[in-house]
Every structure is written in C-alpha cells, then in structure tokens.
Amino acid sequence: MLIFAEKYDRNKEEKRKMKRIISILLYMAVLLPLAAQPPKHEVRAAWITAVYGLDWPQTRTTSPEGIRKQQAELIEILDRLKAANFNTVLFQTRTRGDVLYKSAIEPYNSILTGKVGGDPGYDPLAFAIAECHKRGMECHAWMVTIPLGNRKHVAALGKESVTKKKRAICVPYKREYFLNPGHPQTKEYLMSLVREVVERYDVDGIHFDYLRYPENAPRFPDSYDYRKYSKGRSLAQWRRDNLTEIVRYIYKGVKAMKPWVKVSTCPVGKYKDTSRYPSRGWNAFHTVYQDVQGWLGEGIQDQIYPMLYFRGNHFYPFALDWQEQSNGRQIIPGLGIYFLDPSEGNWTLDEIERQMHFIRAHGLAGEAHYRVKYLMDNTQGLYDALEEDFYTAPALQPAMPWIDNVAPTPPSGLTVETPENGYWKPVSYTHLTLP
C-alpha cells in the first residue's frame, strides 16, 4: 500500500512538472513572439538633408542626364527606406531663405544646379511627394524657419533674398541673418511660404526646424520691437510668446486649408529641467525660448520631434517627460544616429537599440533618424538591425483623433476587367520629369 502511495505521489508531481513545462512552452510559443512583434501603428521617419547636399543631391541638374541622375539618387534612398518598412520622409524643402520647390517667394537653392536660383528643370518637392506616395510613405515638407544664413550666403542670393525684399522683418546677429520673431509680419511671411506648399502640393505634413531664437542670445537685436510690443512682459516671456504666436497662426492656417495635413516641429531635445534629471543649462524653454509643452497643451501641434541626440540620463528622462506632457499628441524622438559614425561620436549600435526599445515600452509614437546618410551607409549595422529586428513588418500611421474619429470610407464601385489579350506585368516606377 505504501509503495502504491509513493508511486501515486510521484505521478502527481510528474504531472505538475509536465503542466509547468507545457505552460512555459506555450508562453514561449505564443506570448514571446507577440511581444517581439513591431507595433501596428508607429511613425518610422528619416530626415533627408539637402543643405550642402549632406544627404541629397550629389549631382547637379546641368543637363537632362543630370536631372535623371539627381532623381535616381533620391529614388535609391526612398527604395531603401521602403525596403526597411519606413513610412515617413522628412524632406528638406526650405533651407536658409531658399527652397527646393518652384516658389514665387524665394529662390531655388543652389545645391540643385550649382547656381543660385537656378531652375533644376523639374520640381524636387513634387517629385519627392509622388515617389514617396508610390511607395506608401508620407512626405513632410521640412522647413528651416528663422535662420537666413551667413553674410556670404545672403549676398549670394542678392535681390532675391528676403533680407532685400522684406528688410523690416530681418535682423543681423553674429555675422548671420535671422527673421525677427518679434515683428508681427514675420508670421505672415512664413505663412505665405507654408501656404504655397500646402495649397499646391499633396504634402502630408509641414515640419518646422529652427523655429527658435539663436541660442544664448541676450543681445539679439529686438529691443525696438520689445519696447513697442511687449506690453509689460519680461523679455524672455515676450520672446516665448512670439514663437507661440507664429506656431498658433500657422497651425490654424494649415488646418483651415487642409485639416489632414500634419503640423510638427523638431525642438531642442530637452524642454527644461525635469524632476528626474537636470538639463544642464541647455533646453528649449530657457535657452531658445521654445515653450513647446505650451504648444502641446494648447493643441497647436500634431507631432513633436524633439531632437534627443543624447544618450543615457540625457535621453531617457527627457523622452519620458515629453510623453507625459504630450496632451495626447504624438511624440517622435529624433535619434542622433550620426553619432554611430566614428568621426562623430563612435556610439555603439546598442545605444540606439536601447533607445528604440524604450520608445516602444513607454508608448511614444515612434522615432525619426537623423540623418538618412547613416541609414544608407548601414553605419554600425543600423540599417540591418532595423530591417531584421525592429521594422520587420510595415506599420500604419498613428491616428489623430483630435482631428476626427471618422474612419476612411470603404472603396466602392470597383470593377475588375480582364481584356481578351491581357497579361500580367510587374509594376515599375517611371521616372518622369515633373513640371
């Protein structure tokens, strides 16, 4: 009887062990793969920098062959982004008082042709939008806002420079020129550029860069405007209010034209000191007068791309702070992938990987990579890691419920026709020169 009881106990114990093993195997087989799956909705963005041809273009359009080569360079970048399941392109559209689209206000950037104001023979922004959309990617017009360039650059633009056309809203400071955020007409001038882009192009977003005062600018020459318009506010508060008014004015203007066009800014990466970690004197609020969390609270931004080109305690507490103060808007940290280059910082790949894991774990909307060259060069194996580990499946854009909650209308009235002599042909991209 005792032997039977011992066998019975052993059998019960073995069954319990087997159940535990089966449970563990089920967890590994079902839950772990689910945890490893990329999010269904996520912004996966890359900045394509045109200034100085840092990312694009390398070829000048001095001939029809030059046009084809310049377009082919961009297509190669977009093809590789699409292959790695990116879904957002931040395409530099305005640099410093010059542009990469056919504008009635500012001249073409010389990087396209080698000549200031030179017509490249096609419209780069229209081409970029069309090629992004062919690949199912959004194209946002990235516009440098306040800086106008150094004296040499402004002189090269000549009479086409805004410093000549709109002297009242431009100021020199430390051998460079800037739009003056304190002048009431500055917001109207910037809105005129945005209006050109939003009205004429099927752009998915307007993305502002350098929407800020020069760093550490106690002597920025705006004392006349401060005396005239400050109405008793401190200089710092007046400057912050000036930038906020520009943001508010343009946001409302864009939404009045096309509510679905996203409006975003890439501010300085640290808003201000947090309870978790200090900003060490370099932040958006105090250093360059960007009250970005105020913009979020007021609902006059759809997305914020904080330039969190840091690591360790200079990244994680501030990324979390942005998310906690987002007011439900999308926070997409900019990752400093250029630091993977040995000549820039020689970060190891795991620095970027840890940041991406953190972004997902804390529910941020995605990330943006600065800049696309380091993706194309597969610096430290980053492109491979994205393609094989992080972006293994396509992702949809996160919803913007503050715009509307209406789902797209299902397609209707579709028909399928089979011609008598028809045949299947794979899709190929036709690289047309756009007007």
Residue ranges and their predicted role:
Residues A72-G97:
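Catalytic domains of carbohydrate-active enzymes, especially glycoside hydrolases
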Residues G53-K69, I146-E196:
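Active-site-adjacent "subsite" loops/lids of carbohydrate-active enzymes
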Residues T430-P435:
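Conserved small/polar residues in nucleotide/adenosyl-binding loops
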